[in-house]
């Protein structure tokens, strides 16, 4: 059963009074008074019972601070990465509030989490759009958040070149709304989900945290603007800030509870793993590799593929290590680049399907080679990627895809 948080208003059935006054005889007065007392007594009893019922008391757990319990707001928690982060937080005994407008996320993912953690005061879902400043402020007013993990964002490079204003609004503007609420309500920690796309196409590899940020597509530019706002605010704030710039995310929950389920209309913009799986399942006739003339070993793009389980582990470590009046900026990757052709071969082995591949011209806004140097996050947070076998990560994701051919609607 989902725990939805929303304002409720109930209208009263009323009828107009007559113009005259009725005179009640003493006996009738007594009967009416008795009924009133009975109604009041029953109402009081109902209120008492409701207040002590789990479904009624659970919202108050979210509205108050509790010693030993850290309450984390996960924006975009119904999405691919956000839902995996929420799962990890819940497993680690955090209290979690998910806020999502479901434009890219899946209510099915929230239902899975609710089924795994049904206890009152563990998880709540709030349907809201972060672009609605009043709604966001209300959420912060009614909940005692200790930290915010801000994942909510549109996140397709190709789509960003076609509809840049959507990206500046959804990423930059909405982050400002969240940041204002964080400041107004004095939330202690902010973990921001950023991207390697803020670096653009650097001259040198691997990418380190001080590599100049020169994004070349609206997605990367919008994310960098959001970073800049957070960094400027942090200069005069006691808030602890962690900015995680991560690379290409793959994989899914090793126990098969969650996976990636993009909206059908967005598949053409989606991750390469999703396209590979669609081709393996026969949803599309084959895989389209865009760009074979890059200055790389085999002519295709080179990327650093990070397993989602490792990624959320980095977020939890960042949350644990975040210190007041400090900012941490970290690359989250494996430190090893893999070409698209290598990725496709790994996907063929993982699925057992000889996927048909068509090679097409480059996609606007893409860059040739991007991979990380994760030395800083290892040194500061004692984090390193564990799931680095590309084929094994794809095998785990493929198992979920096979059992969920229609995403969470298959459950």
UniProtKB/Swiss-Prot annotation:
Stretches that traverse the bilayer: 32-50
Cofactor(s) this protein requires: NAD(+)
Catalysed reactions, semicolon-separated: UDP-beta-L-arabinopyranose = UDP-alpha-D-xylose
Alphabetical list of SUPFAM superfamilies matching this protein: NAD(P)-binding Rossmann-fold domains
InterPro entries with a match to the protein in the record: NAD(P)-bd_dom (IPR016040), NAD(P)-bd_dom_sf (IPR036291), UDP_G4E (IPR005886)
GO CC annotation terms, alphabetical: Golgi cisterna membrane
Ranges of the Lumenal topological domain: 51-411
Gene3D superfamilies: NAD(P)-binding Rossmann-like Domain, UDP-galactose 4-epimerase, domain 1
Active site: 219 (proton acceptor)
Protein name (database record): Probable UDP-arabinose 4-epimerase 3
